[in-house]
Amino acid sequence: YTGMIISTRESKATREKVIRLGVSQISGASKTSVGGYGSPAPEEENSAQFDVSDNRTLDEVVCWLMELGFIPSFCTACYREGRTGDRFMALCKSGRIGDCCHPNALMTLKEYLEDYASEQARRTGSALIRRELGNIPNERIRHIATERLEKIATGQRDFRF
């Protein structure tokens, strides 16, 4: 019940190899310097903690993951719902974590597609979401997720299981 994280320090090729081994978190468009998400610092003031090898945009990483058959997820629901520690482990051990993770991944991807994505990402992601909805085994959860995805398309946000 552990996860592996791979950062943008690694090349695209390395990231593609290891993601198939079970990497559960992957960075995209990371900034490693102080204030890096604000205005870029002049080169002489560069305070980067490490060099980035994968310089693709977040949209490029999201498209790449979808093309590889993965569902990019921006989910923070467990943390926000207090499902940490023993509560989280109980869901994992019972096998019920998928009742949360799968629909939450689809909903957070939908929010990204609506708010930030390129047209290519929207097309690819919309098709992926349609396919993946059918893979939610619990009919009740699938129905609720479908309703929430429709609400996201109308501008509502922040749904979670």
Language-model regions: role of each:
Residues 2-6, 26-28:
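Hydrophobic faces of well-ordered beta-strands that scaffold small-molecule active sites
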Residues 1-4, 68-70:
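A structural motif corresponding to the C-terminal end of an alpha-helix
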Residues 13-14, 25:
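Charged, low-complexity C-terminal accessory regions
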Residues 16, 21, 30-161:
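Radical SAM enzyme core and accessory elements
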Residues 7-11, 31:
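Active-site beta-loop-alpha junctions enriched in small/polar residues
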